[in-house]
């Protein structure tokens, strides 16, 4: 049998239903897609609006802002324990006034008999202390927030300073270690490539001569003066000259003489600067001072000569290396002063932010408090 089912709805009613199915509410937006597999009915428009706007809005203040947890805890403590909060403010205000009072008492007490002392003490007691008490008690939240921000910024700045200092020292240690490692490598390679027996013989002769010279100085039979300094440097340079000429023939005579004169020039500059500084400060070098100077020049001369032989042009590049080191040091100082300036700016922003937070009180809350 055929199902002769006829709809009781008129054609106009069917057209209205088709229109309402495809119409969209502009205020509520599109309907969510319906999953036929899941049980349940379609969500209501009220649920959709809650999901779309999870943050509640207030008609007067707009969207709520994320509050500071410290401020919230302070407000909760203030609301739950108003008497304790009042006593705390009063105690801190009295302590601040007491510190100022006793400071003025200690400082002005010696001048108590003079007119200036009496006026200063009267002004401190009559004007400064009441103003300080009122400011501390009434603006307790403002200045405590400012102090907290100041402490936070100071701690961050000190941590950054420590971090920069540690990094700078680590870089200095790294550069020094690399430089010393290269020097040791150069010396080791040079000694390894030379004849071992001759190296040991010349080295022992060099050490014996050094001990004889310094032993004579200790006994007083030899006055250590400029001649001894020059002779010590010359003997050391000559010994290395013979060693390098015999053992390592790749180093030409011209190159060795050029390096020797460069080293003597550096030593002469060191001696001139030392003598000039001693003359400027009206100091005289005794035997110990001459001994230290001779030992330093002895070691420096041999080291520079050997380094110049292994790395030709090293002495010419040394001023550039020194300039780069000084520039890096000055750059670090400039960065440190820049960090100090940024810290001062952050402290100012902290005070400004604390004042803005204190002034940003809604108008309706102030009106409600006035009505109460």
From Swiss-Prot:
Question: Where in or outside the cell?
Answer: Spore membrane; Vacuole membrane
Can you supply a Gene Ontology BP term from the record?
meiotic drive
Which terms in the GO cellular component ontology are assigned? cytoplasm; membrane; vacuolar membrane
Membrane topology type, per the record? Multi-pass membrane protein
Regions that span the bilayer: 86-106, 120-140, 153-173, 197-217, 233-253, 257-277
A Pfam family hit? WTF
Per the record, the domain of life is Eukaryota
> Which InterPro entries does the UniProt record give?
WTF
Record's keyword terms, sorted: Membrane, Transmembrane, Transmembrane helix, Vacuole
Q: Tell me yes or no: is Protein transport among this UniProt entry's keywords.
A: no
Quaternary form? Homomer. Interacts with other proteins that exhibit high sequence similarity.
What's the family? Belongs to the WTF family.
Q: What does this protein do?
A: Acts as a suppressor component of the dual wtf meiotic drive system, and can suppress but not confer meiotic drive by compatible poisons. Wtf meiotic drive systems promote unequal transmission of alleles from the parental zygote to progeny spores by encoding a poison and an antidote from the same locus; the poison is trans-acting and forms toxic aggregates in all spores within an ascus, wherease the antidote is spore-specific and targets aggregates for degradation by the vacuole.
User: Which named protein is this?
Assistant: Meiotic drive suppressor wtf18
